[in-house]
């Protein structure tokens, strides 16, 4: 427990009636009834903290204290479908929910809720052949530290010992780490389902830590300068350490036509900074809600002039994907996509409805 927060009191759960039309959050630990997700996509939170003076749920507001020592809160409006982080804040102290499984986000271990999307199951576990996610450790001379990447191999990998596979290097968002695409993003289930349906080639997917540490600008240093250093080492680590490590330890196709990179949010920026500066290494590029600094006004010189020869770029980059959710203020990404197309640079724009 933390300042009186407890996940116990299962006897209380047995006596109470749960709000109609709600089910336990899928990320609750076994036996935990709260948080609960309503059919209206609102979330019902309940926390046992009898000695607390104030309890809040991050991003959602203050809870109401009940007579039995529990505090409760219901989302003010329906939540957007998908995964969302939250913390319990008890008298000013933030903590993960003891009723939930931990997820690394916001630069620390926190809790998560899942708002299911009706009629959609591409990210659900199904009765199809399942791939394996393994840990692979290597020493980084650049960072002077041991590092870990998570590696997805398709279900057929061990059954075809002579077959080599294309590789996708997949990066997380700001404040997350190498576990995030597997834990929060369910990438293994997505890949399993796509491969089983014949919508994706069997491939290896590598997830590494983008060095997105929490940072503060040093005395006399501007926030912009500090931000410019944020994750700046990662492209070199990927090119000179991660890719050689993967190609030495897994059966990979090592030419650029069989190598892709994509990333979420800040991972999208790392993707652009890596791939657009190393076009000899990658033929597929993806930004998912991706941050970016592609300068449309100076398109011929940005990223060392990679876009200047339009035909060469379009011939060499087989897919340049820009995706974002309709609830994420997609205007900037749409403007980037339209600007690139107007300049003669092929790209695929996708706006995910309701996310």
Give the positions of each predicted feature.
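Single conserved hydrophobic/aromatic residue that forms the stacking wall/gate
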Residues: 1-9, 13
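Non-catalytic cap/lid and distal C-terminal segments of serine-dependent acyl enzymes
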Residues: 18-26, 31-56, 60, 65-355
